[in-house]
Amino acid sequence: MSSDVSPPPLLSAEAAAQLATAPPVFTTEQILEILPHRYPFLLVDRVVEYQPGQRAVGLKNVTFNEPFFQGHFPNRPIMPGVLIVEAMAQIGGIVLTKLPDVAGRLALFAGIDGVRFRRPVLPGDQLLLSADLLTIRQRRIGKMFCRAQVGGQLVTEGELMFSLVD
């Protein structure tokens, strides 16, 4: 399966605000049924847009009580970039849930390409996470374009690769 999906344009602050208040497509409870991650590593609170096998958009409410803020950094809390990338990968895992070739398989992080960090994520921010499937090859390896935004501003974007295992 392959797709020639082009990443969508960056959402405006107004569009991001509309999605932030949209009813969930998947609640936290449903996300727990889809993803293997658990607290404190589950980084998607709800899914607000879902096109099976193509695209997903979700939210992560970043609070001061996040465990990573204790050490990153004690007097200036900033969400670690690697966890922003992990949150994007998790929303990418949700994109794959309804693909027939993927049922019962686990998507593992296989690489990142061209990921750039544009602004810090702070306590009180709401991350809007999106993932668009670009390709799946030989039903084993694939690539997604992922993006994180806060209030219509780009935080992080890039391509994430995954490997499917039984």
UniProtKB/Swiss-Prot annotation:
- Write out the catalytic residues in the record: H72
Keyword Kinase present in the record's keywords: the answer is: no
Q: Which GO terms describe its cellular component?
A: cytoplasm; membrane
EC no. given is 4.2.1.59
Supply one GO BP term. Answer: fatty acid biosynthetic process
Q: Which reaction does it catalyse?
A: a (3R)-hydroxyacyl-[ACP] = a (2E)-enoyl-[ACP] + H2O
EC class name: lyase
Record's keyword terms, sorted:
Cytoplasm, Lipid A biosynthesis, Lipid biosynthesis, Lipid metabolism, Lyase
Classification via InterPro entries: FabA_FabZ, FabZ, HotDog_dom_sf
Molecular-function GO terms, alphabetical: (3R)-hydroxyacyl-[acyl-carrier-protein] dehydratase activity
Subcellular localization: Cytoplasm
Q: Does the keyword Cytoplasm apply?
A: yes
Q: Which PANTHER family match?
A: 3-HYDROXYACYL-[ACYL-CARRIER-PROTEIN] DEHYDRATASE
User: Per its database record, what is this protein's job?
Assistant: Involved in unsaturated fatty acids biosynthesis. Catalyzes the dehydration of short chain beta-hydroxyacyl-ACPs and long chain saturated and unsaturated beta-hydroxyacyl-ACPs.
Family the entry assigns: Belongs to the thioester dehydratase family. FabZ subfamily.
Under the heading HAMAP family, the entry gives: FabZ
Q: Which NCBIfam families match?
A: fabZ (TIGR01750), PRK00006.1 (NF000582)
This protein is called 3-hydroxyacyl-[acyl-carrier-protein] dehydratase FabZ
Q: Which organism is it from?
A: Synechococcus sp. (strain JA-2-3B'a(2-13))
Q: Which gene encodes it?
A: fabZ
